[in-house]
Amino acid sequence: MPFNPGKKLYISDVTLRDGSHAIRHQYSIQNVKDIARALDKARVDSIEVAHGDGLQGSSFNYGFGAHTDLEWIEAVAGEISHAQIATLLLPGIGTIHDLDNAYKAGARIVRVATHCTEADVSRQHIERARELGMDTVGFLMMSHMTTPENLAVEAKKMESYGATTIYVVDSGGALSMDDVRARFRALKAVLDPSTTTGMHAHHNLSLGVANSIVAVEEGCDRIDASLAGMGAGAGNAPLEVFIAAADRMGWDHGTDLYTLMDAADDIVRPLQDRPVRVDRETLALGYAGVYSSFLRHSEVAANKYGIKTVDILVELGKRRMVGGQEDMIVDVALDLLNKA
């Protein structure tokens, strides 16, 4: 589908899910309410709510959340009147039972997330979401780790299971603008014209906003972003920055920029115990193509064993570790320690 500058962009906020990684999943109920209220006032289309690793992500491996997914979802449901609540489910971490409970708590959109070459495992969850009448999204993580053509094959699988939107997910913040363009062209070549597409960018190479703009130019319908870029690694595409850029380009986004700017600086940024920015460590994520949520885990391991976080991240990239392999971070740290 060619670029249509007149279409309304769907703005999908991820501050209350991906943003959870930035503070080790420690949002309080009051934090969640304050952020949701501001986002709803700004009239974003959806607000994603869950542990950073999705429904039931709270665990020893991924980090325990301050509250349950359902407590967070219910808190948001009580604060919003415009936006819909989205949630994230990674098959193997979350189950159909968890999806049912999230729906009862107020979630009406689910993004079923798999590694970019493993769409097969999403079938049951996508089918159940459609049975519930949810807006059902296929979410292909670490999209830089396969070719555009292979990504399109996986996207087609998710579409065949019932997903009505397919996302290119740059979990490592490693895609260039040409990479994004190639992936959307490959998806558009095989997906049904009625199937919408989305872009989930990370800012590890400072390309989060640029990649989101390129995606829209290639016909992308939905853009993920977060207040102050709150997210794993160097964060997601900063929502207020993307909206300002979209506004200058004359695109219809339907949100209030100044409300988003205030929320980013007054509510979200003060919560960051580690600045969400491009620095030595987060740049290494994008450069090495590493899953962005490995950052905080790697920093803990580096501090414990007296080695550099960057060295751990680069080695994880060499080993092509993917989301869900957080347990390997300590193994890598110990290997590096033994080689020192």
From Swiss-Prot:
Catalytic activity from the UniProt record: (S)-4-hydroxy-2-oxopentanoate = acetaldehyde + pyruvate
Site (Transition state stabilizer): 17
Pfam families assigned: DmpG_comm (PF07836), HMGL-like (PF00682)
Catalytic residue list: 21 (proton acceptor)
Gene Ontology terms, MF aspect: 2-isopropylmalate synthase activity; 4-hydroxy-2-oxovalerate aldolase activity; manganese ion binding
Similarity comment: Belongs to the 4-hydroxy-2-oxovalerate aldolase family.
UniProt name for this protein: 4-hydroxy-2-oxovalerate aldolase
Organism this protein belongs to: Cupriavidus pinatubonensis (strain JMP 134 / LMG 1197)
